[in-house]
């Protein structure tokens, strides 16, 4: 222990530093430390300078390694940005393609809907109407019925202003009933005139064409003054015949004149006032009983 001088402590420190730096594999530094170890305390100051230089080299290496470590991160960021840009472009392309496909499909559907298939009658149905064959036949039948209704509506006076099939049918029924009543009234009036024919000595079968024609021929054989007789209060009756001339007859109680208009005979009975009053009363009673 007495052999060591105060400089031996520096040598020990130098040897320790040399052992620590030996891992750097620098031949110059190792030779320098070996030189210091061999010469002892002759150069302690250069050893401290070498240690400082080693520390600076280590800091430089650490900074270089840090720079080298940061460079891959920048590359990664660039790659990520490029990948995101590519992904956005691909998404846009995909959307555009999908939009084009959808537009093409819509156009194809519209063309197929506009063009009806061959061998099929295209009918645009209204609301509540079908397009099958049965429904088409039903539509045709209803159109024919509506045409007939319009014809009936034109025949009935005052029916053009009525709207609705039910109301139109009611108007037509009322009009037909009124016509039926008029026909019945006329038939009753003609039937009421048959006793008048009996009163003048005429047979009930005298309404036939042959007998009336014979009476007209007899009337033609009479002189003109008799044919021209007239009366201020005539009574009339209608009888259907086929003759086309006008005649005048004379009986015991007065004169009877016949005239024809479009296939119908008009009879005028000219006689005493009493018979005329009875005839008018009979016609009036028949009219009242009918009403």
From Swiss-Prot:
SMART domains attached to this UniProt entry:
HLH
For biological process, the GO terms are: gibberellic acid mediated signaling pathway; positive regulation of gibberellin biosynthetic process; regulation of unidimensional cell growth
Q: Which CDD domains match?
A: bHLH_AtBPE_like (cd18919)
Molecular function in Gene Ontology: DNA-binding transcription factor activity; protein dimerization activity
Recorded hits in Pfam families, A to Z, give:
HLH
Q: Does the keyword Zinc-finger apply?
A: no
Has UniProt tagged this entry with the keyword Transcription regulation? yes
**Which keywords does the record carry?**
Gibberellin signaling pathway, Nucleus, Transcription, Transcription regulation
GO cellular component labels: nucleus
> Where does the record place Basic and acidic residues bias?
80-117
Expressed in which tissues:
Mostly expressed in panicles and stems and, at low levels, in leaves, lamina joints and roots.
Q: Tell me, in a sentence or two, what this protein's role is.
A: Together with BCL2, positive regulator of cell elongation at least partially through increased gibberellic acid (GA) biosynthesis.
Instruction: Describe the subunit structure.
Output: Homodimer. Interacts with IBH1, BC1 and LO9-177.
Q: Give the protein's recorded name.
A: Basic helix-loop-helix protein 80
The species is Oryza sativa subsp. japonica (Rice)
